[in-house]
Amino acid sequence: INLNSITRGISRFESAVLIFDRLKNRGIDVPGSEDIAAWVSTASELSTASLQQEVLRSGSLALRKLQEWNNACNRRIQALEPTFKPFQGVEYSLHQLHTVADVAVVSAANESAIASEWARYGLATHADVIFGQEVGSKANSIASMLACGYESRKVVMVGDAMGDAQAAAANGVSFVPILPGHEAESWRRLQEEALPKLLHGTFSPEYQATLLAQLRSVLHG
């Protein structure tokens, strides 16, 4: 689940539900997993705050365990040494994008973690706004931006997962993939090929289909 699969990029809560489902298919039933699945399928946002509210409301032991695991994940992420850097071409591409467009970060991670990471690597100056898990789904985040007056034909979602493509499609905006394993080339293509097409109105459905096919080809499942 996740890194090199078709489910890459989904939230940790959605990942947990998928794991429970696959365990159940193998005859292993995790007690309380139905409480977690019910919350994930009905919550307006899959965030730490939303989970806390549901734990208090329901008193579910399974959700309380999910909360403990979620908090432990957050602590470990905060404690990670900054050993990884942005892929080659990211900073330059974001700089180029920001000279001609507003840039928003749309993520399933929590906003404080995103802001900290972008600041650490000197990328924060290239983003105008951050939409984290607190805002809701990625599709909701894009919809919020469109509600501010942006034209869908002038908006592009950049991401490395099918969930990003689906969020873009749900709002009628273009999508450019960052192909896992080919990140540097993908960022260069965004800057040199995809962005000019968007700016000149030549980002065709055929071009979009080609990009989506390329992303599907590098993911399994």
PLM regions with names:
Residues 1-109, 206:
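Alpha-helical substrate-recognition element adjacent to the catalytic core
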